[in-house]
C-alpha cells in the first residue's frame, strides 16, 4: 500500500528500541509486486476464467480474505478487498508479470464492459461510498463516532490507544464542530471540493 514505507520505518524503530535483542532483518518487497485492482459488480465474472486454484465465490472468499493460486498461469496472491465500496479484488503478481496479467484481465473484461481507472477515480468512488481516509477527511477533532466507526472502539477493554483523547472535555462538548455529508437536490450537480 501507499503506507508500506511508514510501516517499515515503524517496525525498524521498534526493533531498535523495543526488541534490540531480536536477531531480525526487515526487507521491503513492495517493488517486487505488481498490484491490479479489479472492482465492480462483475469482477468475479472477469477474473473467474483466468484464476486457477481459487474459489472466488462469496462463501469461499469473503470480504477481507486472501488466497494464493494462479492467474493466467502466474503465481498470485489474491485479496478480496475493495477501496471503492464495490465488490472487488486485488491481484498481486510478481512485478515482471504485471503488464501481461493486466492486459489479460483487460481483454477478459471487454465482454463485461471493463474500464481502466486511476487513483483519482478510485478516491472519488471511495468517498462516494463513505470510505474515509483517517488524516485526509479527518483530523484530531473527529471521533470514531463522528464518522460511523464507533463500533471499532474497544469499550469492553480497560484501556486502548486513543482512550484519553476521546475523554477530553473538548471532544465531548455538544457545540463542537461536526463532520457531515452533503447531498445536492439535483444528483447530477457535483459539489466542488473544499
List PLM regions with ranges.
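Conserved, structured C-terminal
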Residues: 1-194
Amino acid at each position: 500500500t501507499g503506507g508500506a514505507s511508514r510501516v517499515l520505518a515503524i517496525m525498524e524503530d521498534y526493533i531498535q528500541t523495543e526488541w534490540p535483542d531480536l536477531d531480525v532483518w526487515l526487507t521491503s518487497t513492495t517493488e517486487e509486486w505488481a498490484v491490479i485492482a479489479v472492482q465492480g459488480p462483475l469482477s468475479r465474472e472477469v477474473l473467474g476464467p483466468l484464476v486457477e486454484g481459487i474459489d472466488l465465490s462469496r462463501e469461499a472468499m469473503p470480504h477481507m480474505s486472501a488466497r494464493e493460486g494462479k492467474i493466467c498461469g502466474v503465481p498470485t496472491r489474491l485479496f478480496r478487498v475493495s477501496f471503492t465500496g464495490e465488490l472487488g479484488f486485488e491481484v498481486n503478481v510478481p512485478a515482471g508479470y504485471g503488464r501481461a496479467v493486466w492486459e489479460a484481465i483487460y481483454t477478459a473484461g471487454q465482454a463485461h464492459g471493463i474500464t481502466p481507472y486511476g487513483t483519482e477515480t478510485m478516491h472519488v468512488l471511495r468517498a462516494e461510498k463513505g470510505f474515509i481516509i483517517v488524516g485526509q477527511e479527518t483530523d484530531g477533532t473527529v471521533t470514531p463516532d463522528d464518522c460511523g466507526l464507533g463500533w471499532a472502539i474497544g469499550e469492553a477493554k480497560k484501556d486502548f490507544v486513543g482512550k484519553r483523547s476521546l475523554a477530553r472535555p473538548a471532544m465531548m462538548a455538544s457545540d463542537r464542530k461536526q463532520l457531515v455529508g452533503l447531498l445536492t437536490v439535483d444528483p447530477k450537480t457535483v459539489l466542488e471540493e473544499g
